[in-house]
A protein has these predicted regions:
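Generic surface-pattern signal
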Residues: 13-16, 124
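Acidic, serine/threonine-rich low-complexity disordered tracts
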Residues: 24-101, 106-111, 125-219
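C-terminal motif of bacterial Sec signal peptides marking the signal peptidase cleavage site
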Residues: 19-22
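Bacterial N-terminal signal peptides that target proteins for export
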Residues: 2-14
Length: 219
């Protein structure tokens, strides 16, 4: 019930801000996500006392509000599930900082089955870790698409913001089959501080790539 009341207050405020601003832009995904008055710098209209995720796509910024956070323990590892909502009620579900599902956007991941390596184990590994994720992608009814991923300790990508001391960077090398044939090969980057992803660069498709930064609790 508390999560539901939070969602009504935080998302309601963001949705109202979106209506005031007109939600106009160039990128269709940004049009759907926009929750602030137009401009490159985020004039964020957010509610105090709640946690937000800053999102950048094509150089424009917006915010999503945390609707729920849950820790699930499996095989001795803690999996942190977070559900982030925009002012237009789009939702991005992240697990340990990685996009797991995304609904209401121009590209949706409706289901995922994967077992990505835990950040702590990656930090201790001297070699890349190879794994797979199976996702259902819309539009196009691409059910069971299998991406092959190699993850390893890395360095900050060009243009990434400075991070606190002790932050460790990781990089994904992703090979994703495309509907017209061939593979889309790209990188994803994650900054992990005290076991938590505080900044990342991730993609849903070749045309929908995000930069995520945790804003924390807005006072």
């Amino acid at each position: 019930m508390r999560d539901f009341r939070f969602w009504l207050r935080a998302i309601g405020g963001l949705w109202g801000a979106c209506l005031l601003s007109g939600c106009l832009g160039v990128n269709p995904t940004m049009d759907m996500l926009t929750t602030f008055l137009p401009g490159k710098e985020p004039a964020l209209m957010v509610a105090k006392g709640y946690e937000y995720l800053l999102i950048e796509i094509d150089g424009r910024k917006t915010a999503m509000a945390l609707g729920a956070r849950q820790e699930v323990i499996g095989a001795g590892d803690v999996m942190v599930h977070e559900h982030w909502y925009s002012g237009q009620r789009e939702m991005i579900h992240m697990v340990n900082g990685r996009i797991y599902t995304a609904l209401g956007l121009t590209v949706e991941w409706r289901r995922q089955q994967s077992s990505p390596p835990i950040w702590a184990s990656l930090a201790a590994s001297q070699v890349p870790v190879t794994w797979q994720r199976e996702i259902d992608v819309m539009p196009g009814y691409r059910f069971g698409q299998t991406d092959r991923i190699e993850t390893q300790v890395g360095s900050a990508p060009f243009g990434a913001p400075a991070q606190a001391g002790g932050t460790q960077w990781f990089v994904d090398h992703v090979r994703s089959p495309q509907p017209l044939g061939g593979d889309w090969v790209y990188k994803q980057h994650f900054a992990v501080h005290q076991g938590r992803v505080v900044y990342s660069e991730q993609c849903l498709s070749p045309n929908v790539c995000f930069k995520f930064k945790h804003l924390g609790l807005v006072q």
